[in-house]
Amino acid sequence: MSRTDDIVELGHLCASYALRMTRGDITYVIENLMTADGTYSAFGEVYSLQDWPALVEAAPRGLFLCGDPELHLDGDTATGQVPLLFVDQTNHRMRMGWYSDTYRRTDAGWRLATRSMSFLRRSGDVDAGNPHDPRRPTPTGTPGEP
């Protein structure tokens, strides 16, 4: 595969994530876009894939609008950052920030290994987010693991 092919595939992966999260299709995200040991970090905590269905259930629904990823390729691994604008479907309030990702090439193609969220605040600060629902799961991910 060429570098250009890798960049196109990783861009498609990021776009698929945004569309599937907008549609609420977390099963597709887990089974087709993440590595089996993948994690998601938000609120200063690391969530494993087994936590994701409950985490998504506790989260607001809405539009995940992502820009093109900035990618750094290194053989069968890569890192990247993806701008995100989230629009809550109930009140159209927006949240903005970016994902910081690690990617791994698998037999099935490129997959997300880790994804962490950074939120931009009106004050100019950046943070990992405010927990939005006390029903969110207790995280079972391990910091630093892909």
Residue ranges and their predicted role:
Residues 1-28, 32:
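Short, low-complexity N-terminal intrinsically disordered segments enriched in polar/charged residues
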Residues 12, 62-64, 94-96:
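Short solvent-exposed loop/turn micro-motifs enriched in small/polar/acidic residues
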Residues 23-86:
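A solvent-exposed, acidic/Ser-Thr-rich amphipathic alpha-helical stretch
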Residues 39-40, 45, 89, 122-124, ...:
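Outer-membrane beta-barrel domain signature
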Residues 59, 87-94, 122:
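Short, cysteine-centered beta-strand-loop-beta hairpins and adjacent loop/turn segments enriched
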Residues 79, 96-130:
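Short beta-strand edge/turn micro-motifs at domain boundaries
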Residues 123-146:
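Acidic/histidine-enriched, glycine/proline-rich intrinsically disordered or flexible terminal extensions
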